[in-house]
């Protein structure tokens, strides 16, 4: 059952008619330690974690804000009634505001916007989500696992879960912090069953958290749906209205953006001005020059994903349809009712990172991928799309012992003992949705790993497979 649209407040002028913000950072990159960026980080994270995930500030300070604590910044202030968060730097020079709308998530206001500008934010309201508590997973939330979270048919998974949470076994450097691990297996009747599920204290089946770059996998699926509906072709140039006729960037194809080989200048994974500064997506993503011929260089770039979503908005040519598209065409059909895709102040999805969801919703997404983009007998993704995203990008060399890259997904089958064809999303701080196609498995791991500490998802995959006796 999909949400039904009830009302729309989208009081902005058309995108190109809106005055540009007073600053535009190349590629949306910025100094992560700049006081205005840190204040923005604290505002947007507190807003999403509190109003969407329903977590108290005391916990948010220890989890979401742990990497920016100890710098003399005052605690963010939460306005429950108006659903706002205020944050500032130690000198109170930079005052940042994040605003929550129940069906849109949180948006960080740009520095030049005031409290009186909050009503200008895009806001689509939906009917309440259906009650699926009595439906069996993945359609609903009925699971029936015992207290330890392990299906009695697979007792050997108990030790795997213990290792996943110990902060050492699957860590490149000790200190990982796992918040959830889910293992889903398809049986002989083609039913997907949750056979293991465990959470860190303070988190649970409805605990939302930022996906970081796992959002790129969701964005890829949205572009795939647009392709299935005849809006675009992978090998055709991407449709970006900000690039005029004769602009060499108009040669860049959808496929090259998907494979992180656009050839554009980029801040790489640094999009701090967009994520935490309040810069709009379009000025950040469309304003960078071409450095090399498209398709000849692989460079991980948030902007490539943001350009894909900018193109989707242009192709749809309808702001309301654009805001509804992820929910109407993907999330709600899959039963992902606990997922929100956040937007900037001009209504652009920040879909390279800023999606909030639960581990169970990520599992639903992984099941959909394992079904080759078919849901309840209906093909949502083009045939062959999953093969495309899980095939190595031509511009990136395959190196044994290093993860490969496909198209908005990472490839794990370059790692020891990992089966061929295994692919995964990968978000900062350890957000993974991993599909092992030949073994009927989906493995979700979420975390709040400290900066500089990486969780080894490939080792979790191998441990699960060994526990299930699917590999020696």
Regions found by a protein language model. Give the residues of each.
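Active-site SXXK
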Residues: 181, 188, 192, 209-235, ...
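A short, well-structured edge-of-sheet supersecondary motif
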Residues: 86, 159-203, 434, 440-444
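Active-site helix/loop module of the DD-peptidase/beta-lactamase fold
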Residues: 229-263, 287-289, 317-353
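Active-site Gly/Thr loop motif
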Residues: 336-340, 387-443
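Active-site-proximal alpha-helical segments within enzyme catalytic domains
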Residues: 220, 304-312, 353-374, 431-447
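Short, charged, amphipathic alpha-helices and their helix-cap/turn boundaries
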Residues: 189-198, 271-294, 320-339
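Non-catalytic propeptide/linker segments at domain boundaries
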Residues: 88-173
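Conserved catalytic neighborhood of penicillin-recognizing serine enzymes
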Residues: 244-273, 277-296, 301-306, 357-360
